[in-house]
Amino acid sequence: MLGVNGQGKSNCLEAIGYISALRSFRTQLTKPLFQKNTNEFQLFYEIEHERLGLTQVELQIKEKHKVLLIDGDPVKRLADFIGLFPVVPLHSGDLMILRGSPSERRRFFDMTLASVDPDYFEALRMYHRTIQERNHLLKMRSKDLAFDAFEKELAKFAFSLVTKRKEGIGQISQILANVYKAFSEDNESPLLAYKPDTDLASVHDYEQFFAEQRKKDLIMGSTSRGPHRDDYVISLAIGGAKEYGSDGQQRGLSVALRMAQASLFELKLKI
């Protein structure tokens, strides 16, 4: 794709990539994607799909509302859409997966796992919704009884997320090691490890945990512990890649992560 600066090459790539997860690879926000003085945009795709054949997709995007159509039929659940049209972007911002905060790594691996497992996407969505509801109760300093129902649901989704993350990261770690060795000159295998903030044996254990955290969380006004605080660590022989990896190693690993993501999509989604 050739063109002068400011002609819209990146915008075109951004529009292509948007279909994957209904978000841009450069920002989590929707508002910066609108043309000046507008509050919505539409995207139309015609795709030769491996399983669906020739497919037309229409996206109508507003700041707080999205309409998705596949061959003219509305998509009722986002979980049914994520993963249908996977796109793997490769861009300079990928270095933040290595160098950035835990939220950068959670975002990358959440989207990777959600794209190949609708149940993961649904557990993630419901976990964050329930966290918001519990946080509202904490700010309102509600009675203990009001928390019980929310914490029961929160425990169920927390246990599901941690279980699925363990399984998924185990698969990605093996793929990552093979991919990195294939193009790296240092001939070592990186290790991807999942570091859960809470690693408990059952849903009941999570219920007890959130109940025990309630007093502390009331003081803070938010839910301080749980899978939304998880992290992932990539290590080389010298130690953690974030702390000890050279600039070249970090760049190589960021590329390898995207290649591993593509390989996982190919394996799980049969594309």
How does the language model describe each region?
Residues 1-4, 18, 145-271:
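Conserved NTPase motor "head" modules and their coupling/switch loops across ABC/AAA+ ATPases, GTPases
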Residues 24, 139-143, 267:
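Short, flexible helix-adjacent loops and helix caps
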Residues 96-184:
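An accessory alpha-helical subdomain
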Residues 38-45, 134-139, 160, 206, ...:
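Alpha-helix boundary/capping detector
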Residues 17-104, 110-116, 120, 170-181, ...:
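Nucleotide-state sensing region of NTPase/ATPase domains
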Residues 9:
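Conserved lysine of the Walker
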